[in-house]
Amino acid sequence: MITIYGKANCGFCTKAKSFADQREFTYEYKDVGMSKDTLNELMDRAPVQVKSVPQIFIGNEYIGGYNEFTKYVEETGYNGTGETL
């Protein structure tokens, strides 16, 4: 399962969701601007200091932002099921 942490009015967050939608990936979107608990969850999960959104995980694997997400999908052939092609 893909988890996208983002916030309102974030262009790259919108692009990450659109990228996932176009590929019919199932994902959970968590708005860090709506809940301090969600922001704290992201800070606890990320292996780096979070300075921007989106921050994306596939399962428990930290991917990074939008550019890292698209690169990961293209390079690994990830198909949204947790498997690669």
Residue ranges with predicted function:
Residues T14, S18, N40, K71:
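Alpha-helical elements of the RecA-like P-loop NTPase motor core of helicases
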Residues M1, N9, M43, E68-E74:
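Catalytic phosphate/metal-binding cores of nucleic-acid and nucleotide-processing enzymes, i.e., regions
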Residues G11, D37, G64:
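Short alpha-helical
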Residues M1-E28:
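Local sequence-structure signature of Cys/Sec-based thiol-disulfide redox active-site neighborhoods
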Residues I58-L85:
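Non-catalytic, surface beta->alpha helical segment in thiol-disulfide oxidoreductase systems
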Residues E41-A46, G77:
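Short amphipathic alpha-helix with an adjacent loop that forms part of the alpha/beta core around
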Residues A46-I56, Y66-N67:
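Structural micro-motif
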